[in-house]
Structure formats: structure tokens, C-alpha cells
Amino acid sequence: MFSNNRNRFFKCINDNSIALFYSGHSHYKSGDQLFPFEVNKNFYYLTGIQQDGSILILIKKSLMQKTFLFIPNINPIHKLWNDNQLNKEQITNISKISYNDIYEMKDFNVWLNQQICEFKSLSPKVYFDIPYYHKKYYCWGYEQVYKFLSSWPWIEIANSSPILLNLRKQKNNEEINYIKHAIDIHYHSLIYTFNNLKKCQYEFEISAHFHYFLEMQKAKNAFETIVASGKNALTLHYNKNNSKLNDEDICLMDAGVVINNYSSDITRCFPLKHKFTSIQNQIYDLVLNTNKILINWVKPEHSMQDLNRYGKQILAQGMLKLGFVEKIENYFYHSISHYLGLDTHDVLGISPEEPIGENSVISIEPGLYIEHLNLGIRIEDNIIVKKQGNINLSAKIPKEIAEIESLIIK
């Protein structure tokens, strides 16, 4: 898969070009403790390697394609303390990059200078991975632009990020199977959680049951799980998960599962101990109906902007029928969809006006948030957008009122 991804990228760049990608580096948490390493997703997409301090170089010269990888210097002492450094054999097996084209970082500067100088007469273009949010966070590619231009002012600089975003947007069968696997684990984790709901007195206990089951499947959470009961569901990214559960409340659970680096992102709402009340039922039914309509309505030629506009229209009309006359923005204040893949909010930087395209995996997540009712309802599914009819990958995860109530009452 990864060599094929590189070949697709090569087709998108100019001849006489060099593209560089950095895997990222570990960040200190406090003292000598590090945060868990999170690989740069474009680097991973092209290599399958999850190792910090590594640089991928792709060279297209006179229609020849070459791939090189530089990895951290091998340190025998480091290996006694950490098990996160892959050897060249392992890297070749995963990435299909030739063993002889993998070098240690100590050789990088001399090697790179030689390559650039060989290109001088060809007016080369050098691609760096510079995401649209590069000014908010440290960006290796952005930093390298200035270093390259100061050393080799005759080169032309280009951004590879838009190319990678468009390649990653449409998923191949292998990627879709990874997402299906994540959703399958999500389903079983959620059912396990429902089966243990009666034992729970606090939000964090619900979260704990979910995490226990998914970790037993060698998976991990894609983001901080949201378990928001009652008024807490009015806050979209509520993550304290520490409130005592109230039998009369609805609980919103927004969670994601990662396996093989691909994510699910699914939200379900359920009553605590009892059935939905009449007004809870009405609001839930409106959100559910909107969810179902949008799953079937969206087409590859539609944009995220189209999807959001139509979803808000359905919610607004429904709320008006229920007697809520204020503007819909008072009750719905987030996007109805996002792309899904290596990141939970995948390929950030794609224009919301751009067609979604076939074989994109997206979320469908309408919601309503009503402060005076202490009620937040969001129903989120993950679908593949297809010309001949979309596929709801999370269809088996219960969302009908009767299904939810039967699970709670058990």
C-alpha cells in the first residue's frame, strides 16, 4: 500500500523535483517524561513507518523515481531503554523502501548537499510538507524553507501538503478495511459499555468500560472520549467526564477507536436508567431523521458546504414544527461532517467548497443543543460516499430509540 501511495505522489509532482517529509519528533511532557509519539500522517501515508526523527526523500529526475529514508543514528544504549527504534530490515519490510536506500541521520547533510548540487543545472523544485495551520504549531517543512533558500537560493520551493491531502481524501480498499475494523471494535466496545451501564454512577465509569474493552482488542482511543450527561452535552468538546449521573438525563457519548492508524468517530445518545421522555424523544427523532436523510442524500459531487447547508435546513424546519422559533444557530453550532481516516478530522485544509468525491469516508453528525432542557443530542455515523449509493459503515451500531431503550433496560 505504501509504495503505491508513493507512486501516486510521484505522478503529481514535476520532473526534476525533490520532496522531503519529516516524521516528527517526541515532545516533552514534564521533567524527563515524553508525550506518546504521534507520527506525521503524510509521512506515514508514504512509508507506513512510525518512528520519530526520520526524513523521507523522494526524487524524480529525468523521469526516474528514487526513494530514500534517513533514520535516527543507531544507539545501542538507547535500545536498552526504549523499544521504539526500528532496524533497517523492519523498515524495508513495512515500507518496501530498499535496504540500501536507508541511511542514518549522521550522513544526511552531506548526502543532501550532494543531491541538490547535482540538480543545479536542472532548475529543481523542492517540495516541503507545510500544512495550512503551520503558523499555529512547529512545522519542520516551514523551517526548512528558509534554510534551503539561504544555502541554495536558486531552487524553487513548493508545498506538497495540498497534493497529499487530495490523495488521502479518497480511500483505497485497504484503508476502508482498516476503518471497518476500527468501527467493528467500536461497536463491541459500545455494546459492552451498555451492558455495564447499570453499574455506573459517574461519567468516567462509562468511559472506563468503553476503554477497557477497546484496549483488550489492542486498539486505543482516537481522541479524549466525551461522556457528557445532561447539561454537559451542551459543550461540544466536554471532556471532564466527572459528573454524577442523573437518572432523568440523556448521556451523549462521542468516541473514536484507532487500529492500524485508522479511526472511527461515532456518537450515540442514550437515557440513563429510564426511557426517553416525550420532549427528549421528539428532539432525538428530529436529529435521527436528519442523520438518515443526509446519509442517503450526499453525493460525490456535493461539497461539505452543501452538506452543512442542507443539514441545517432540515434541522431548522424540524425545530420550527416543534415550536422553537429562534434561529437554528442557537441550537446547532458545529459542522455536520468531516473527513475521516488517518486523522479523526482528516485532511484538514481541503476547501469546504470542494466536491467530496467518491470513496471519501466522512462523518454525518447532526445535533441539537437546548440549554433550558439540559439536553444535547448528536448522532454520528461514518459513511463511504459512492456514486451508486453511500455505505453506512457504522449501521450496526444501535441508534433507533427502540434499540437504545432495549439495551438500557436490560
Protein language model annotation of sequence segments:
Residues 1-410:
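Active-site neighborhoods and metal-handling regions in enzymes and metal-associated proteins
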